A protein has these predicted regions:
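Arg/Lys-rich, positively charged N-terminal/basic patches that mediate binding to nucleic acids
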Residues: 1-28
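Enriched for short, Lys/Arg-rich terminal
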Residues: 19, 41, 58-62, 66-88
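Short, C-terminally biased terminal segments at protein or domain edges
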Residues: 1, 28-30, 50, 76, ...
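A short, surface-exposed loop/turn module that caps and links secondary-structure elements
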Residues: 30-57
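A short, compositionally biased N-terminal segment around positions ~18-40 that is enriched
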Residues: 19-38, 76
Length: 88
């Protein structure tokens, strides 16, 4: 699948100091890139009330993604208690 990153997502990941967490994010991005469809992505769940918004769970953190026109946009990254206030 084609993958793109928003500036917000890139800034949130750059601020991270936890290298293990950065590695988990990289693994999630890799799994999206090799997936043939959304059903092939592990830990993916559709957000209710939104047609194109999904989240990927990585421990206590969530990656907010948008799926539009066969492109996956990595849009946000935050702790599980904060992600739903800022995304989508």
């Amino acid at each position: 699948m084609k993958v793109e990153f928003t500036r917000k997502f890139e800034a949130q990941v750059e601020r991270l100091r936890d290298e293990k967490l950065k590695l988990e994010i990289a693994n999630a991005v890799r799994s999206v890139m090799v997936a043939n469809s959304l059903n092939d992505i592990p830990q993916l769940k559709k957000l209710s009330g939104f047609k194109t918004a999904f989240r990927i769970r990585t421990g206590n953190y969530r990656i907010g993604i948008l799926f539009q026109n066969d492109i996956v946009y990595f849009a946000a990254f935050a702790h599980r208690k904060d992600i739903y206030n800022n995304f989508p």
